Amino acid sequence: MINRDNKKAITKKGMISNRLNKFSIRKYTVGTASILVGTTLIFGLGNQEAKAAENTSTENAKQDDATTSDNKEVVSETENNSTTENNSTNPIKKETNTDSQPEAKKESTSSSTQKQQNNVTATTETKPQNIEKENVKPSTDKTATEDTSVILEEKKAPNNTNNDVTTKPSTSEPSTSEIQTKPTTPQESTNIENSQPQPTPSKVDNQVTDATNPKEPVNVSKEELKNNPEKLKELVRNDSNTDHSTKPVATAPTSVAPKRVNAKMRFAVAQPAAVASNNVNDLIKVTKQTIKVGDGKDNVAAAHDGKDIEYDTEFTIDNKVKKGDTMTINYDKNVIPSDLTDKNDPIDITDPSGEVIAKGTFDKATKQITYTFTDYVDKYEDIKSRLTLYSYIDKKTVPNETSLNLTFATAGKETSQNVTVDYQDPMVHGDSNIQSIFTKLDEDKQTIEQQIYVNPLKKSATNTKVDIAGSQVDDYGNIKLGNGSTIIDQNTEIKVYKVNSDQQLPQSNRIYDFSQYEDVTSQFDNKKSFSNNVATLDFGDINSAYIIKVVSKYTPTSDGELDIAQGTSMRTTDKYGYYNYAGYSNFIVTSNDTGGGDGTVKPEEKLYKIGDYVWEDVDKDGVQGTDSKEKPMANVLVTLTYPDGTTKSVRTDANGHYEFGGLKDGETYTVKFETPTGYLPTKVNGTTDGEKDSNGSSVTVKINGKDDMSLDTGFYKEPKYNLGDYVWEDTNKDGIQDANEPGIKDVKVTLKDSTGKVIGTTTTDASGKYKFTDLDNGNYTVEFETPAGYTPTVKNTTADDKDSNGLTTTGVIKDADNMTLDRGFYKTPKYSLGDYVWYDSNKDGKQDSTEKGIKDVTVTLQNEKGEVIGTTKTDENGKYRFDNLDSGKYKVIFEKPAGLTQTVTNTTEDDKDADGGEVDVTITDHDDFTLDNGYFEEDTSDSDSDSDSDSDSDSDSDSDSDSDSDSDSDSDSDSDSDSDSDSDSDSDSDSDSDSDSDSDSDSDSDSDSDSDSDSDSDSDSDSDSDSDSDSDSDSDSDSDSDSDSDSDSDSDSDSDSDSDSDSDSDSDSDSDSDSDSDSDSDSDSDSDSDSDSDSDSDSDSDSDSDAGKHTPVKPMSTTKDHHNKAKALPETGSENNGSNNATLFGGLFAALGSLLLFGRRKKQNK
């Protein structure tokens, strides 16, 4: 900056702080990328110097001859918060602020400029001193940073300074806690790398970065490279030898050489094969991936300091890949390959000899590189590649400092790294605060865009002026020629935007959408001046932030390189009228050489080749041509390993020849030959003639200024052997092959290798012989399948050639056939099972000699799995049998014959008892004829009853019966009755009866009755019966009854019965009855009944009766079930109701007698 108010030395606390920031862009030469370095020069000493460990500041003053005799004491005053107002919580949260001690000046006093939040007292009457420049040792721990910091304060500004610029009043523009921009869609641009201040001597402010070769100049035009492929290869080879570390390059005394973008993008490879023109990510195997940020120590991406993000990936390419196939490399969405230019074309993948393996294209929208393979992959095999890609934080997607998880991917395989994004802070001195970066380089239009933040901390600044200089500036703000420049004149595009109080500026110092800010460019039409390649904008008094966008022209150097520098500074006056300066200088300098020289292209390096011959060494002597049957071997894989570990492979041609070219003198290579299947390597160095011998499977060779075509190797066919022998029937089961024992044919034999893989299957011939042929030396396993109907014999009982080896055995081939693997089997014996089913008449479960067998009983046989393997029926003697059974577990199931009942089981010995309906049995080397079963027939009933009954009964019965009965009755009755009766009856009966009866009856009755009866009966009967009965009765009854009964009966009965009975009854009754009665009856009844019934009844009966009867009846309580156990009925009422039951039975028999009498009389009448 030029001090136009006082061209002599500034004498009052005048210091300038310099910041040198670098800007990384990508420049493509010979398929590689170059870094263009930028630096920033800062005016206004600030606290930011503390961030760079090596930064120092120098305080200098020029003596003013006109004022040295007139110095007055300076009254020191405190300026509180001189650099902290409006920025305590702003995203631009750090200030670089430096203060100088006060120096005496004759005409004025002033307060000192202070460090942030500190008070400093100035002294007075200090003799002015000449400002001297101090050389500072350059910093080397920031790759592309070169900063110097100095502060200069000018003489009090003229009184009319405040009147030069009228500032637009702003409404409430306080400091805000963050600076933000509206989100914008990603756009492709090149990144600017700005670094924090580092001290350098003020006389050396340039940065030079070698983009291709740090040792020698390379002056080759793009046209020459296109027309000269060999020169292109040479440059790539030079690049592969370049030291790509991040250490500084020795150039100018204080320059620091940063890493080259994409300088490490080297690939070593060898060939694939696949399907044409498709993505083959699945055929790419990633072996290593790493992400490194800057120096890799703290993972901090200092986006304004030129710190790059380095992505290293190593991968192999499958041999299936073919020309035209593609693979992908993905950048993280928050990075870009370059943000100063739009040149994002990726480097081609080449091998160390310069052959192109794949060409890449970059998609800005997806941030993805697509590589398309050349015919290289059709010529070579086993390709291994390494790739190093550099990228930078995308300021569009990352506008403010933050933490990110960056993810990169090769062929879809991802790796991630956490990083912290750090942006620069404004330079601050007093109320002056400013920062700037280069944002876009257009090499076609030869323009550079710079964006400047003016007063980003929104301080209240007075007499504000901003200078934009087309060069760097020195410590005093004077233009410094050389080391880059731009053209600043009336044709320079300068736009000014005002930031409202509610808007926040992005910390990235990069604006993509200016429409969100107020365009106030027109307000500076009369407040903008140009002079000596400097534009000055007069802002006047401000308390808002502003953005200046400058698009200036530049002139490339004669060799087409870029020497671009542009500075900007802000000056304001403090309350005493003294100027405070703060500023930046941005510059880009590129060069393709750093070591000097005449700029001519280095003579092309001579390259060499190696190779020769692979042959079949029939006589195994290791010497070519000693046997007429020897011939070349085609399609043998030969792999070359480069000194850096990368490889490529070729196959021998039809003549057995191979060759590798493009090899460098003095370097050591390794050649490996893959042993073809079915061959073995021959003898090594079988002769002293290096042109005729075999060098073995692997040979190392060093290039000594000439080709080496003597690297040969020979192979011979591996001999083959047989394995096998014999499978025989071991009739005596001794495990030894006897002369009279025959072979077994069609036995399956399986051969497996040492890994268990089946390599052959065969069957024995008619003699029991088998053989496997064409086998190599090694261990094998033989498995014999047991033939149907045979059992394996004992093994290993005698010598190998005569014994049995077992179902699975191991055989070893060692330079000879192995015909000792035998196996013996004997026929498996069969067994029978069965016995007898009989009629167990006495139901004791034992087979008695008098009991007979039951024929046609179905018997089923099941195996252990429950599968039916046989069904038969017993013969006329009750016998059954199953034959041809193996040892094992079985189940025998007997089907019960109709009408018969299963007898009791397991009552005696197995061969005489009954085993039940289902029997489990195990056969172990013998027959089993003990599986028997017995059945018996249920009993029937025969009853003969003769009853003569004379009964006079007066009965009062009270019965409570609950009965559940299901009854099925079929009755056929034929009755012929002739009755003459005269009856006079006076009966008074009170009966309460509730009856539920279900009856099915078929009755045919013909009755002729003449009755004369005189009966006087007074009966009061109240009967309540609740009966619950469940009865299953099967009865066959033949009854012949003759009864003569004279009875006078008066009975009143009330019964409530609920009965469920299942009864099957077949009754044939013939009754002949002749009855004449008027009377008084005396009844004697004798009944013998045998009944099997199951009944449950609850009965309550109260009876008053006078009767005489004799009834021998089996009590119901002694009725038995099918287990022959007494089954008692539940008690219902009093136990002395026997007489009541007798009366009821007496009445029943009297009625039966009358029926018989009537029938007899009728017959007599007939």
UniProtKB/Swiss-Prot annotation:
Membrane disposition: Peptidoglycan-anchor
Domain of life: Bacteria
Keywords: Calcium, Cell wall, Peptidoglycan-anchor, Repeat, Secreted, Signal, Virulence
Upregulation: Expressed at both exponential and stationary phases.
Propeptide: 1133-1166
Motif (YSIRK-G/S signaling motif): 23-34
Gene3D superfamilies per UniProt: 2.60.40.1280, 2.60.40.1290, Immunoglobulins
Sequence ranges of Basic and acidic residues compositional bias: 61-75, 92-108, 130-145, 221-230
GO cellular component: extracellular region
Signal sequence range: 1-52
Claim: Secreted is one of the keywords in the record: yes
InterPro entries reported in the protein's UniProt record: Adhesin_Fg-bd_dom_2, Adhesion_dom_sf, Fibrogen-bd_dom1, Ig-like_fold, LPXTG_anchor, SDr-like, Sdr_B, SDR_Ig
Bias (Acidic residues) ranges: 908-918, 935-1105
Pfam family for this entry, one: YSIRK_signal
PROSITE patterns: GRAM_POS_ANCHORING (PS50847)
Biological function: Cell surface-associated calcium-binding protein which plays an important role in adhesion and pathogenesis. Contributes to the resistance to killing by innate immune components in blood and thus attenuates bacterial clearance by interacting with host complement factor H/CFAH and modulating its activity. Inhibits also bacterial opsonization and killing by interacting with host complement regulator C4BPA and thus inhibiting classical complement pathway activation.
Protein name: Serine-aspartate repeat-containing protein E
Organism lineage string: Bacteria, Bacillati, Bacillota, Bacilli, Bacillales
